[in-house]
Amino acid sequence: AYVLYTSGSTGRPKGVGVSHGALWTHLQDFLATFGIDGTDIVLHSSTINFDVALHETLPALLRGATVEMRGAQPWDLQSLSERLVKRRVTFARIPTALWQQWQRHAPPRAQLALRQVTVGGEALPGDALARWREGPLADIRLDNLYGPTETTVAALYRRTGADD
């Protein structure tokens, strides 16, 4: 299906091939887990050469959802919030570090259509999760994803809950 180049843990670049079957199985599981459908507006925030971009595009396209493309400029807190509000995004994957900053400056809940946020790329700190769970955005589902490129984007999904 695709080849991505990564240095992984070795620091030496290598091509990682992912088969059509592995990608298809992964996408079916992702869709079943997160329930993306034709009514969703999914935020695309990663560069296309990063495997996470597949989570931000392919599930939405398979279900007839809208993909809200990032554009050439990287996100800052204000532009991320403006895009989420203006485009009525319902599903967003936000890098963990950016999410931690964004939740402190997020727009009021009534302005957001978000139903699901996924974070990943680094550990999800417990204090940041507690702040989310105790704050005004607590009804937006938050899940942590992890996986090296070799495992077809993400190998583990952690659905966060009240006890986390």
What are these regions (language model features)?
Residues 1-164:
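Motif- and composition-driven signal specific to adenylation
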